[in-house]
Amino acid sequence: SLAGLEAVTDGQIILDGEDITTKEPKDRNIGMVFQQYSLFPNMTVEENLAFGLKLKKLPQEEIHERISKAIKIVELEGKEKAYPSNLSGGQQQRVALARGIVMQPKVLLLDEPLSAIDAKLRKSLQLSIREIHNKLGLTTIFVTHDQDEAMVMSDVIHLFHDGVIEQ
């Protein structure tokens, strides 16, 4: 419901003092990183990052600046012209993360972003995501079913059951 992909059945979603309950997903200013990377296979890393910015009709110079900054943050310098099929799983996930942050959202929602990655790489990406979170000062909601991952990634942990915070 937070991202607007499912209808809210009860209550409201307030973000920065604004009721976004009925807003379309594109109008909520929430960055989203899915479990599956959902990269456009026919677009380079740079083009994948530019896609949402172009939809917002931002000036080309600003698009370039945001992409450069996001590429640096996720440590993918030199991969701007690469296609997803030429990247490792970890690199693809970092592109997905960069695509989430390049839009400068108020909240970054990560929906089990590391579940499809092997254990060794998962630990490394956990640290990277944590560093990015701290560097940007961005409110980040990290959804996981892995208790250890929750402990590593979180400042605050909420346990949900049927949409209700239980603990």
Spans of features found by a protein language model:
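ABC ATPase nucleotide-binding domains
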Residues: 23-31, 35-167
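Helix-to-loop junction immediately C-terminal to a conserved catalytic motif
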Residues: 3
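A position-specific signal in ABC ATPase nucleotide-binding domains
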Residues: 6-7, 54
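Conserved ABC transporter NBD signature motif
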Residues: 11-18
